[in-house]
Amino acid sequence: MKYIIMCGGNYQNWYFPRQLLEVKGEPIVARTIRLLKERGVDPEDIFISSDNPVFKQYAPVLHHENRYETDIFDIDNNGLWTDAFYPTDEPCTYLMGDVVFSPDAIKTIVETETDDIEFFASAPPFSPLYTKPWAEPFAFKVVNQPHLRSAIQLTQIFMRQGAFRRKPIAWELWQVIKTQALNVIEYDSYVHINDYTCDVDGPEDLAKIEEKMPYETSMERIG
C-alpha cells in the first residue's frame, strides 16, 4: 500500500502552501509523514503529490498539477477537486495534505482493510475536541483503482449536467462511489474519525486545533 499526501490546489489567498503551516512547531505535512512512519508505514511507500518542488524536502514528490480553486460554488472555474488524485494502478491511500491528523486517526486509516474503496471523515455527533460545526473529509483508501477512475469520470459528468449544487469535492465523489443519492451526506456510509483531526483553512483554525491537542511525544522527534 502506497500513501500519497495530496498537496495540490491553487489557494489564491496564500503566499505559501498551507500544508506547510506549523502545528506545534512542525509543518502539517511533516507531521503526517512522521505519524505514518510511527504507525509502521515504510518511508519508501510515502509520497507527496504536487507540482511544487518545495515539498521535496519532506518526501518524494509525484509531479501532479491540480489547479483546484477554493471557491466550490464557482462551477465555471476550470480547477476541480476531483483532479487531485494522482493516477496509479497500485493500491494507495490518499490523505488530505492540509489535515492535522491525530495518531489515532492515522492508526485507523492504516489498519482499516478494504478490497475496494474506503472513505474517512468526521461525522456528527462530533467529539468535544473537534473544532468545526460541520464534517470534513480526511482520506480515501483505494484498492480498486479502476472503480475510483470511473467514479471520478461519472462525478464530472454529473457536474456538467448540473446534478450538484456546487463543484464536487470529496463528499460528492463518495456519493457516486457508493451510488447514493446526490447532494445528501450519508454519515453511516464511511469510517468515522472523531477527535481533534481536522483540516486547516487558516492560522485561526490551527490555533483552535492546538488548544485541543493533548501532549504528544514522538521518539523520532526526541531522537
What are these regions (language model features)?
Residues 1, 43-44, 89-91, 97:
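Short coil/turn segments at beta-strand junctions that form active-site/ligand-binding loops
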Residues 1-16, 20:
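N-terminal nucleotide-binding beta1-loop-alpha1 segment
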Residues 2-6, 29, 45-46:
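Hydrophobic targeting segments
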Residues 27-43:
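A short, N-terminal amphipathic alpha-helix
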Residues 49-55:
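Short, polar loop motifs at secondary-structure junctions
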Residues 55-93, 100-103:
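Short phosphate-binding loop-to-helix
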Residues 101-194:
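Conserved core of the sugar-phosphate nucleotidyltransferase
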Residues 188-223:
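C-terminal catalytic/acceptor-binding lobe
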